[in-house]
Amino acid sequence: MKSLSLLALAAIAPPAAVAAVVDHQVPFENRPVQGLPEKFLIQLGPEQTRWVTEDEKWALKMEGVNFFDITAEPDRGFSVKSHERIQVSFPSEVKHQTELAPLLEQLSKDNMRQNLVHFTSFHTRYYKSETGVQSATWLFEQVEEAIQDSGAAQHAVKVERFEHSWGQFSIIATIPGRTNKTVVIGAHQDSINLFLPSILPAPGADDDGSGTVTILEAFRVLLQSEAVQQGNAANTIEFHWYSAEEAGLLGSQAIFSDYSKTGRDIKAMLQQDMTGYVEGTTKAGEVESVGVITDFVDPGLTEFIKRVITGYCTIPFVLTQCGYACSDHASASRYGYPSAFVIESEFKRSNQRIHTTGDTVDLLSFDHMLQHARMTLAFAYELAFAEL
């Protein structure tokens, strides 16, 4: 997810680790040169691109700079032409409180805790690591188990791997509806320790283990609805767990690029990245809330999400911004699909221990994660039955 500043990381990590990262920086080049370290083309803004090494990627993230890695598709800018954008009218009110009431009661903090404790037990979920593949395999099995336990497999509900060249695969679970119009809920499964990504532990409890288990729990409970499970909803619902978000939104870009090329009808995408940290808000003497991102998102979808939070959560929302390419919703936007993002708090109050060994389960509130799970479940159900 979002990047910590070098100053914030220095307060958490040993000085030698900071020095090691800074010493690896080299001057930026305009293009890759034979014989030098491999370069990647990143996009730091709608009109700003740069060739960088992998070490320079991590140094930028330590300075709080977000980016797309667009090496695979350098000609695709963030801002697509207006006629290429998917235009969707979202519901003006929530309508399924009666159907959702018994489902909301089934959301379990204990399930989320148990899953997150196991998910963070992998040494790292770095997208190029062996344990990153192992963690993805475990997560895939949990999604598969939720489908089997609900009996939804007999109704064509399925989970598939979306393979990538770097090892760790993304995961896509599909709940078919009566049409191919599709609503996507996403989180990223990878983690990173910015000091030595391929070596040091990266528990990634909040970033983004919290979002991963939040949407997993919403997925599990959504399958308890016979109407959804049996394909009676108007729209198809997909749950995505992306690989390689930390490296420049690589996994989500690959998926939405594929969807664009194959003409998939994606009506909405909601990202859940960092859903568990509330201490920054409460220590500041502010009211616990969820943060609705307002920059680089679809305004209509964001307005609908405000209605969902008001209708189904027991805490309010606060409007906030996270900057360019701050999480996987930006990949959906890059390919013309309406996207939105809800984070754990106002952005400045969010977890400052991400990307270090200090991003651990004990710092998180499962009561707060339950609020995100309620929102995710309600969002999925409401849009499943909406005319989009």
From Swiss-Prot:
GO terms for cellular component: extracellular region. SUPFAM superfamilies: Zn-dependent exopeptidases (SSF53187). One of its GO terms (biological process) is proteolysis. The keyword Protease applies. Residues 1-19 form the signal peptide. Disulfide bonds join 322-326. It is found in: Secreted. Monomer. Extracellular aminopeptidase that allows assimilation of proteinaceous substrates. This is Leucine aminopeptidase 1. It comes from Coccidioides posadasii (strain RMSCC 757 / Silveira) (Valley fever fungus). The gene is LAP1.
